Amino acid sequence: SKTLRAGNACPCYVFCKRMTYLLWIAYKGTNYGGFQVQPNAPTVCAAVQDAMQRVLGCRPDVKGCSRTDAGVHARRFALSFCYTGKVPAEKMVQAFNAHLPPDIRALEIWPVAENFHARYAAHAKTYRYYILNARVDDPFTFDTCCRIGPELDVAAMQAAAERFVGTHDFLALCASGS
């Protein structure tokens, strides 16, 4: 028998056949200490769970596709959670967005297999880094671009970029067992 902590666990884990969902979100991470819940900083996951608690009446255990560091943004981030209740999936996105801060948005939701896990189902990640080649910061992109003041040697950068083209095995950079 499982013990429930008030305001923490979702009762669907104990009493009902659970339904697993894949929720796609986007967020600007400037105001957050990353995705994963931490005791000393606001996090994206905690904000999502707060919204879920208000909409679903329980706080599901959320599994993100990846961890992100403080200040990192995500245009399309997958997370999975289980829930059985009265709120239909087609109403969840709009309802979550009504309770999420404006820098986090729910995009779409799909029912998935019960054993689906967002982290283990992720097969690829795409990272984008933006460089602003200017003497002065742009007030609209200062927190999403790295400003480089001196003129860049574009030809040298293109030559260096050629070395990245193709498929590469970065398994040696992964944590053991991941």
Model regions and ranges:
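Short Gly/Ser/Thr- and charged-rich N-terminal loops/segments
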Residues: 5
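Structured-RNA-binding interfaces characteristic of tRNA pseudouridine synthases
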Residues: 13-178
